[in-house]
């Protein structure tokens, strides 16, 4: 098999040197972009150097260590796309408002807020595009404020410098032993299967609620992390296409096993049932490895094949999902062709995407960015401060990058501390070290490389202020061609950065995000819709796989309400009911199909209702329709395994009516 460069790292492969691999990678990328920027006679090599630092340092700070190869490349591609969108936005604003500078700045603030609003609605791995587009437009307009006719030239130069910086980062990543995620994926798949089997053992043995909650919570997080690894794997190379398809299905199989194990536990708690000795004999022995789980699942399959009458239906479903999981894991490990059996598994379900539940949260994020940049613009215009532009730029950068992260306040503090650290560090570099290196590009690269290396080590440790210090210090050094050493300009820029970050942090703290309860209620009502939407006689709709979307919403619920176990249990019950109702054998009937459509429409109205009274009225209507639906099923003399789950869903919704409708 032909090996790629990813499989043959060139440097820093030993464990002792691997700890400093990222710092050397970051340093090499920064120094190479600086050297090429001067060699190619770029106007502002500083942009290429900052791009290299941001693209390499950002993922490392988030990961708390060396980022995977795919993460760096993905970040680079997003930065290119976001820059192009920002340049187009800047050209459009300048062309339309060239005779009205104040209107131009106002449109800039609105554009930044709009981009941040969009970035809060899209998938989090792609949100960087729109956040970057917002402040790129602001940077271009501020840089060409006195000479708007040069905007196209400046936009082209900025795009060229950013592409150069990204190319240097990717080359450094390939050169310094890229960290492939494939081995981590294989290990996570094995560990996840062991965790799934242990959850099943706890469910069958009647463990206490605290242990069950802790275990399934950890498995949900590991399954979500596995889906993130799948995205990183695809960023590495296109040769992982087959593994990507398998991992998508493995995500569903893992969620199915979690759901079936939890349903088994809840069913046994409600109706205690004696577990056969033959079943206990297979389930009770502890498992320590992936091989042990494979052996136990095989024994369970033989037991079910011999006599499935005394085996809980949820356990049968769990074993089926585990069998599919084991089959697909083997394919991921080899990355071979997809067999016919695997293709049947992969094509069985059609995954459904759902819109974001954080629309109000996104609106607050956009408002924060728009207000913050408008305040910076007002401060600049009223004072006439020469570095008001860089203050505005830092406000836009901080508010755009911080809002989508789980803790915007900490991101704002990191930038504020970083800009404060950059003042003495930048002064040392700008006043004493860099002037002594003007006769030699080698000395210039060595001095900047030494600073980058030590800051890179701190970034890898997630030291507060380290990433902000790296970016802010490079920004105030003014690495232009030719270089000039204007002390007053340096101080203005350094202080402007600090004030901009302070204003951004104040806006984050003062404009509070009070949408938490609204988001939680929307998520819970979407769980209800997911459960009732499983009631259908349409075979095509039955193949719709809502499970990944439901667990994605559950994961968001976990992040927004980390200590509210009641919400978790309600959401988990709705997911369980979705899975149970999806398997009901409902006969083809025009009247039932019409009732299904009516129930779905009412559940959708519960989600869309803006007022509590309207929501409560629609929720009461939904309960009445479900009760009437159960009566129709009973009148048609359908078996209890069809009517009882519908009654169970109605009972759960009635118990939680206050939490769901008010």
From Swiss-Prot:
GO terms for cellular component: plasma membrane. It holds the Pfam family FUSC. The keyword Cell wall biogenesis/degradation does not apply. InterPro entries: PHBA_efflux_AaeB/fusaric-R, PHBA_efflux_pump_AaeB. GO terms for biological process: carboxylic acid transport. The chain crosses the membrane at residues 22-42, 52-72, 78-98, 102-122, 129-149, 161-181, 378-398, 415-435, 439-459, 467-487, 491-511. Its main location: membrane. The keyword Nucleotide-binding does not apply. Keywords: Cell inner membrane, Cell membrane, Membrane, Transmembrane, Transmembrane helix, Transport. It comes from the Bacteria. It is a multi-pass membrane protein. GO terms for molecular function: transmembrane transporter activity. It is found in: Cell inner membrane. Belongs to the aromatic acid exporter ArAE (TC 2.A.85) family. Forms an efflux pump with AaeA. Could function as a metabolic relief valve, allowing to eliminate certain compounds when they accumulate to high levels in the cell. This is p-hydroxybenzoic acid efflux pump subunit AaeB. It comes from Pectobacterium parmentieri (strain WPP163).
